[in-house]
Amino acid sequence: MSNAPTALTLAGWQQAYRDGQSPAELLHALRLKLRTDDSAWIALASEAQLDAQLDALASALQEAAGDLSKLPLYGVPFAIKDNIDAAGWPTTAACPEFAYGAETDASVVARLRAAGAILIGKTNLDQFATGLVGTRSPYGAVPNSFNLDYVSGGSSSGSASVVARGLVPFSLGTDTAGSGRVPAGFNNIVGLKPTKGWLPNTGLVPACRSIDCISVFALTVADALTVANIAGGYDAADAYSRKNPNSAKVGMPTKPRLAVPANPEFFGDSQNQTVYEAALGKLRELGAELVEIDFAPFRQLAEQLYYGPWVAERTVAVEGVDPAHINPVVRGIVENGHRYSACDAYKAEYIRAELSRRINDALTGFDALVVPTSPTIRTLAEMQAEPVLFNSQFGTYTNFTNLADLCALAVPAGLRADGLPAGITLIAPAWHDQALAAFGQRWQQALNLPLGATGKPLPVQITSDKPAQGCIRVAVVGAHLTGMPLNFQLSTRDAVLVEQTTSAAHYRLFALPGTVPPKPGLARVAEDGAEIIVELWDVPQARFGEFVAEIPPPLGIGNLELADGRWVKGFICEPYALDGARDITSFGGWRAFIAETRK
């Protein structure tokens, strides 16, 4: 990576900067590479906007005393869907007459910029985020990144497209009905649909305000999770923001128990069905137990989103907009909101509550539900002929998710016979985002598909039970985690991140007082233990002694048991240091605790 930006992942950009490249050089080259006639973009950063961000980045690095670990997204370009505010940029929601100049960043954008990320552009969408197709915009339809005759999926069409083509390593979308998942499936990328309220919606143009989610697109699950962990967290300015109770599992068993729909519907699309069935076979190869469940309550709840009073939320969101300026298909949808009464809304809420209870009961005893991301895909011409029917088909396996308060992770599953991608989605109850991502990383490595539409291979990630040759596998739990202050002690010694997983349920985590930077102590206990999030790193044997020599008391290296029964080297703590230390086990890991203390 010398003259033009070609890195596709966060690690690629970070490595470029470690190799001596400058953000100014790489990001100005990227800006010149991007085309204004690309329908995925609504606005691109001007030279002045980019320079202002680069100046702010230089100041942030100076404040960090040159420590890049304090800016985990240092110099990484990203894009946001143009219904999300960025200070100094217009927000259009794909409706020029609605547009306004944003005076402040949306909360998620502010957090990403504070971590060093650089906003390079705002992306196209189905107008007012109403649609799963990517064709309902006055800025043009966004075509599929694999075949220009097909839809890209929506409503976060542009955000998915620019990631799939490797223009940015990550982007933000939104997901109310599936807008952060369907485009991921259609473009061979990852779409992380977080638990409602994890990523705050402050600065988001609402679609259905009570169930809207800001989502993340990336080429890898690891990158999507990193971005979500930075952007997420409670925001008092958002009435729908929630604090993570830290009660959900953060890992998944080696042999998970997964629910799958009985008699899944593909609307005659045998190619999508073939990819899905092959994916189920691969899950079995990975040790998963698959159990069919009745999908009727999921389907019934999905129907409520567009064929019930929830459509009135969309009506409220655009009530100040002249109907003449709204896309005809979108206008037809939002005008339906006037058909429903307050009585209808309460009746629908009772139905939602009953079906949600049935859905969550059905998922009890399972680690996740696995569904096709979309049952089918359509051409642009087909979508023009049947815009509502085919949109409804795309939402078969997505529309129920937010109404039932579930989280989801869309991941690539393979290519169809015609060369188009298809995906699967992992779904679980609220706050199981980390567990889904843990298995999603394992799944992505097992399939080893090319990244998006770039044709480039997935970066090698060591996933075997044994460390790489000449390395010692070490579990880190605190300040050495990715993006934390002491992570450089691993990265500068050529250590390689293997995976995120959890300890066995025999440990408790404590915040050690007076440590700089703040550090936790992990202690094995005889009872009342819990699983704690850890990262596994393979450290070269030749550098292991140097690494251990930098570990101050009361910490040291010992043996640590993982949730799947493996034993690795890991951080331990002298018992004397735990006297009076705060027990933070309920947070599930050090990163969640640190995020809470910063609020």
Spans of features found by a protein language model:
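Gly/Ser-rich, acidic/histidine-flanked active-site/gating loops
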Residues: P5, T9, G75, A87, ...
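A short helix-breaking turn/cap at a secondary-structure junction
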Residues: K193-Y276, P297, A438-K466
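Acidic/His- and Gly-rich active-site-bordering loop/insert found
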Residues: L50-A52, E63-S137
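Short Gly/aromatic-enriched secondary-structure transition segments
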Residues: A43, A93-A94, L486-S503
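Short helix-loop capping/hinge segments that flank enzyme active sites or metal/cofactor-binding pockets
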Residues: A4, A11, P72-C95, P253-P261, ...
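An N-terminal boundary/leader segment
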Residues: M1-D55, E285-G287, G452-L458
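Glycine-rich, small-residue loops and helix-cap segments
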Residues: L30, G75, A114, V168-P169, ...
